[in-house]
């Protein structure tokens, strides 16, 4: 399954657009394990806890996007976009949304 942020795939013409596919992944962030995460964020450092949660959420959202495209018998998902949200005021979770267009290639 090809995943691309572009609307076309070089050398691979699109035969059919199958529709929009989307997925999401929610990850809890345990700042107890990374007590200084907020201080690092404040002073411009990197939070390993947040980076790890974002990476995992993005990977899970991508895999779910592929699974939904396979259900449509797609060969690829083009125009993929990721959006990140932290709905908790305390920063206790991160949500990654992935959307794209499932396509069948020639």
UniProtKB/Swiss-Prot annotation:
InterPro entries reported for this sequence: UPF0145_dom_sf (IPR035439), UPF0145_YbjQ-like (IPR002765)
A Pfam family it matches: YbjQ_1
Similarity field: Belongs to the UPF0145 family.
PANTHER family in alphabetical order: UPF0145 PROTEIN YBJQ
The protein, known as: UPF0145 protein PputW619_2377
Source organism of the structure: Pseudomonas putida (strain W619)
């Amino acid at each position: 399954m090809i995943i691309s942020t572009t609307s076309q795939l070089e050398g691979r013409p699109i035969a059919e657009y199958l529709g929009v596919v989307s997925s999401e992944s929610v990850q809890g962030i345990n700042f107890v394990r990374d007590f200084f995460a907020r201080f690092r964020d404040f002073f411009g450092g990197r939070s390993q806890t947040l980076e790890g949660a974002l990476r995992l959420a993005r990977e899970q959202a991508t895999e779910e996007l592929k699974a939904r495209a396979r259900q449509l018998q797609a060969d690829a998902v083009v125009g993929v976009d990721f959006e990140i949200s932290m709905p908790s005021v305390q920063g206790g979770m991160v949500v990654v949304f992935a959307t794209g267009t499932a396509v069948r290639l020639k």
